[in-house]
């Protein structure tokens, strides 16, 4: 079933009334002074880990994020087959498949040899090789994946919910403290990402940085991002296209002249 006919709107698309889809804003509450695990960042990796740990009532997990609230518009949308297999373990793979667009084929276009001012389809292949997985490759807004993880967390044994509007200032490790060796210091926002000097401190056994490429966790422990960068210009657009391009609903690679 196609849910999003006129662009993406946050919330569960099975709820027809857009106003009813809106989730209540998070309750403002102080961070605990001590816990077992602190996850910095409500990224997909952070929410995945929080959802796993939330299944255990005796593990006190805290997850924080810089944003004021849950994600409403995502920054990515591709879900690989293996990712859906993981979602199946959480119990929401089928709902993702129902909401998502299935990528079944890849079409390749290149300049038409008979008229280089035009392009022509040169070939088509299956998007997923045979017997790779029982799950499909799909496209769905990242915000919906966050919603599903948050629902798993909220209804889990530990009833875990994120602490939003927290900016990590510092992380230190005291090896002499065997019970709670890690200390994290956060600055708390008062209104819409306007941070002041209201500081909160949490001591924990383990801290996990899921706060992206410019990770403050990584910086605090003295590490640097190791990897290569490509000197390539590229972009991503999220548009409602009015077009007569025949493969608009396929994953398509177009080679220009």
Which residues does each predicted region cover?
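Extreme N-terminal leader/targeting segments of oxidoreductases
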Residues: 1-37, 52-59, 178-180
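Active-site-adjacent segment of FAD-dependent monooxygenases/related oxidoreductases
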Residues: 4, 9, 72-155, 159, ...
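Core beta-strand elements of the Rossmann-like FAD/NAD(P) dinucleotide-binding domain
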Residues: 33-35, 192-206, 210
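Conserved structural-core and active-site-/substrate-pathway-adjacent residues in large, well-folded domains
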Residues: 39-41, 50, 87, 146-149, ...
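N-terminal Rossmann-fold NAD(P) dinucleotide-binding loop
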Residues: 46-47
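Glycine-rich FAD pyrophosphate-binding loop
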Residues: 51-77
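Conserved FAD-binding catalytic core of PHBH/FMO-like flavoproteins
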Residues: 151, 206-257
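Conserved SAM/SAH-binding loop
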Residues: 165-169, 189-190
């Amino acid at each position: 079933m196609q849910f999003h006919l006129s662009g993406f709107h946050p919330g569960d698309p099975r709820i027809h009334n857009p106003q009813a889809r809106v989730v209540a804003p998070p309750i403002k509450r102080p961070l605990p002074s001590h816990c077992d695990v602190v996850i910095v960042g409500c990224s997909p990796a952070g929410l995945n880990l929080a959802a796993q740990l939330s299944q255990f009532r005796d593990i006190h997990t805290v997850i924080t994020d810089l944003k004021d609230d849950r994600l409403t518009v995502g920054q990515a949308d591709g879900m690989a087959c293996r990712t859906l297999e993981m979602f199946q373990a959480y119990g929401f793979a089928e709902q993702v498949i129902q909401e998502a667009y299935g990528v079944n084929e890849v079409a390749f276009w290149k300049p038409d040899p008979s008229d280089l001012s035009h392009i022509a389809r040169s070939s088509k292949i299956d998007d997923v090789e045979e017997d790779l997985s029982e799950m499909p490759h799909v496209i769905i807004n990242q915000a919906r994946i966050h919603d599903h993880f948050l629902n798993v967390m909220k209804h889990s044994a530990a009833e875990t919910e994120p602490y939003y509007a927290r900016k990590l200032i510092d992380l230190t490790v005291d090896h002499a403290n065997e019970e709670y060796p890690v200390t994290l210091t956060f600055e708390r926002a008062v209104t819409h990402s306007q941070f002041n000097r209201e500081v909160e401190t949490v001591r924990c056994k383990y801290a996990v940085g899921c706060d992206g490429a410019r990770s403050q966790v990584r910086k605090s422990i003295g590490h640097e991002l190791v990897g290569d960068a490509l000197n390539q210009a590229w972009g991503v657009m999220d548009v409602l296209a009015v077009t007569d391009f025949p493969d608009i609903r396929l994953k398509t690679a177009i080679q220009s002249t």
